Amino acid sequence: MAISLQKSTVVKVVGVSLVMLLAACSTDQRYKRQVSGDESYLTAPGLKPLNAPSGMILPVQNGEFDVRTVNSQGAVGKQLDIRPPVQPLTLLSGSRAENATDTSKLLLENSPQNRDLWAQVTRVLQDHNWPIASRQDASQTLTTDWIKWNRADEDVQFEGRYQISVQEQGYQLALVVKSLELQQGGKTITQYSEIQRYNSAMLNAIIEGLDKVRADSESSQASRKVGTLDVQSGSDDTGLPLLIVRAPYAVVWERLPAALEKVGMKVTDRSRPQGTVSVTSKSLSSSSWDALGAKDPELPEGDYKLQVGDLDNRSSLQFIGPKGHTLTQAQNDALVAVFQAAFSQTSATAIK
């Protein structure tokens, strides 16, 4: 009985220790920021001058092979943050980003598409429930209150205040995010890399929100548009065959899944920013083709990739077959009448 009790106690102690160890591991996120491996290089002896024995003739010294002593200052070993800089998202057409010490800037074309940029930016902040300390619509500038970040690679989370503005710069519009103050655990952070990391994180969050706002608007407009879309055969810059649809990208994107379903192609995955659609094609019965009013293109069954291109007021559709090759010219031409009929019998889809 005493032995059994002792074993039970040992099991409980081991169990509690294991739980505590796992809990500690689950909250310690340093492994995501630190280099792993041997750190013996930190204690390696420094370089010393070569002392040749008396009478030995050494080769002529060549400066190209000198290993110079460099007194560098900065974090080393476990103190070195190995995370790469946050890169700006390229979700908005024609955009490019610039970074300075405490400022991240997104440059966009000063076009009708970006006419309502300021209103869209303020909507994104409201959708995120981010606190706004002050706002001046006349100058298109606002200042946020403290925004708390929640990153899985930080033990102690950061919070920051930002100034966000939209500025006209000639033929461009600039969306500017400026860091006013960054804190971690109540302590002010002045390290450039951290300020830039969270500045870029703020800019990317706004970019994602803008992309969603615009996608929702385009989807709403496309869902109200029905009717026949003109489809023609064409080719890309390298001469490979594709389909040309005389409708904007947003309209084609929303109506495409239903049209694909109509011709026996089931959508398995799609990405609007990349314009890619994955489908699985299965043969239809002759009665289905008769109902569609088109001739069977006789495509082999299997998985296809579809690349959707944005050509302003037109769109392109290029199919890549199961073996990784584009369709032949004959196969592509056969799909013209097929998709002409499919688009005429379908409207926008609810698939996202």
UniProtKB/Swiss-Prot annotation:
Pfam families: Lipoprotein_18. Keywords: Cell outer membrane, Lipoprotein, Membrane, Palmitate, Signal. A lipid is attached at residue 25 (N-palmitoyl cysteine). HAMAP family: OM_assembly_BamC. A lipid is attached at residue 25 (S-diacylglycerol cysteine). Part of the outer membrane protein assembly complex, which is involved in assembly and insertion of beta-barrel proteins into the outer membrane. The keyword Membrane applies. Gene3D superfamilies: 3.30.530.50, Outer membrane protein assembly factor BamC (3.30.310.170). It comes from the Bacteria. GO terms for cellular component: cell outer membrane. One of its GO terms (biological process) is protein insertion into membrane. This is Outer membrane protein assembly factor BamC. Belongs to the BamC family. Its main location: membrane. InterPro entries: BamC, BamC_C, NlpB/DapX. It is a lipid-anchor. Residues 1-24 form the signal peptide. The lineage of its organism: Bacteria, Pseudomonadati, Pseudomonadota, Gammaproteobacteria, Enterobacterales. It is found in: Cell outer membrane.
